């Protein structure tokens, strides 16, 4: 990656750290409304449930065995067993008051659809390292 270190990538990511976003600050401060949390939980479930497909797409394009094995281990963490990530997120969404229909069939906000499309493009098109960076960040 011509002079770019993992440390420098981590520093770039830290500038945009998730917990710096106003939504997460409101959540941390206890000022986030229950309605906003429910909407977030239902929307984010779409991304969490799609995440294993991002890994699968990247795994299928990767030629490096060691990297493929790491992706496979991550995919197992995402999907295997009853404590898989989509199931855990679903339980969280239900715990904050989302109904099954809100989680599964509710309207997908344009921002959510855009994020999912961006991840799908990052892992399916261009260099594999681009997809790895998207999953890492």
Residue ranges of model-derived segments:
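Acidic, low-complexity proline/glycine-rich segments
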Residues: 1-23
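Generic serine detector
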Residues: 2-8, 34, 49, 56, ...
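Active-site-proximal alpha-helical scaffolds that flank and shape metal-associated catalytic sites
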Residues: 4, 69-137
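Alpha-helical bundle segments that constitute or directly flank the non-heme di-iron/ferroxidase center
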Residues: 12-18, 26-63, 80-84, 130-137
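Broad hydrophobic/π-residue packing in well-ordered secondary structure
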Residues: 19, 23, 37-40, 47, ...
